[in-house]
């Protein structure tokens, strides 16, 4: 899956892991949203997704509050929906040409950046409705499973719930960690993985975790709104580059 990588590809991979980890540390989300589209510039979507296997797990598990799981009770309807949706979306992902998936990733990233830049929120009555949470989760899961970009619609939902900064961070990590279960169940069902592939994703942990650690250390020292907006501008550029590569 990762044989014959040239120096440029390795540098792009390192850059994506460092930037994704740092962003996760600073604003509590954004690791796969940042890293995945950059990786798809130099790797097929399936390889890019597996490269992030261990980094995504460890980047999120460290911020989950396992001592008080009742904090996540409010997310149960959304979680059921997104879990089911990912199974459907992942089926589409693994049965569609990689070029089409890459284009879908580019478009999703650009739309996500625009919506978040505008600060879009779901109506307070809707976001508190369990049926809406279930259906919105299902839709989010289908889109996320199909493009492997799980964060965008999930972030909009969590922002709309108006959690405190700490609880928002914990809920993002919990949901991302939970969605990895159906995502990678489907991955291992359809893709052949060898021992060397696990070694590569293990090595990817080093830059990702180090940069997340740095991001966590300066989380309260960087104006988060400014950093978030710069991240969204960068995402738009990356999305356009992905589209440019696969459309022209």
Language model features: what each stretch is:
Residues 88-94, 98, 102, 142-149, ...:
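Hydrophobic alpha-helical transmembrane segments in multi-pass integral membrane proteins
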Residues 60-70, 104-128, 213-217, 237-248:
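Transmembrane helix exit motif
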Residues 14-74, 141, 151-205:
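Small-residue-rich hydrophobic segments that form or flank transmembrane alpha-helices
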Residues 46-118:
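Membrane helix-loop-helix hairpins that form the core translocation module of multi-pass transporters
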Residues 1-23, 127-142:
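Small-residue-enriched transmembrane helix starts and helix-helix packing motifs
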Residues 71-82, 103-108, 127-137, 170-174, ...:
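Cytoplasmic-side transmembrane-helix entry/capping segments in multi-pass membrane proteins
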Residues 214-236:
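Interfacial loop-to-transmembrane junctions
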């Amino acid at each position: 899956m990762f044989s014959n990588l040239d120096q440029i590809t390795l540098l792009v991979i390192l850059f994506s892991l460092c930037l994704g980890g740092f962003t996760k540390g600073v604003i509590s989300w954004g690791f796969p949203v940042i890293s995945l589209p950059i990786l798809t510039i130099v790797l097929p979507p399936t390889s890019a997704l597996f490269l992030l296997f261990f980094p995504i797990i460890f980047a999120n598990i460290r911020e989950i509050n396992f001592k008080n799981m009742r904090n996540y009770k409010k997310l149960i309807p959304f979680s059921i929906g997104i879990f089911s949706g990912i199974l459907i979306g992942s089926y589409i992902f693994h049965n569609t040409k990689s070029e089409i998936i890459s284009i879908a990733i580019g478009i999703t990233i650009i739309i996500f950046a625009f919506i978040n830049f505008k600060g879009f929120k779901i109506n307070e009555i809707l976001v508190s409705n369990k049926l809406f949470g279930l259906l919105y989760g299902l839709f989010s899961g289908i889109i996320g499973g199909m493009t492997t970009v799980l964060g965008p619609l999930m972030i909009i939902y969590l922002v709309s719930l108006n959690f405190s900064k700490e609880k928002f961070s914990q809920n993002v990590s919990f949901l991302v960690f939970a969605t990895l279960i159906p995502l990678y169940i489907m991955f291992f069902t359809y893709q052949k993985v060898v021992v060397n592939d696990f070694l590569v994703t293990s090595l990817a942990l080093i830059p990702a975790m180090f940069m997340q650690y740095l991001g966590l250390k300066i989380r309260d020292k960087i104006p988060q709104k400014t950093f978030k907006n710069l991240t969204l501008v960068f995402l738009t550029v990356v999305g356009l580059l992905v589209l440019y590569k696969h459309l022209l």
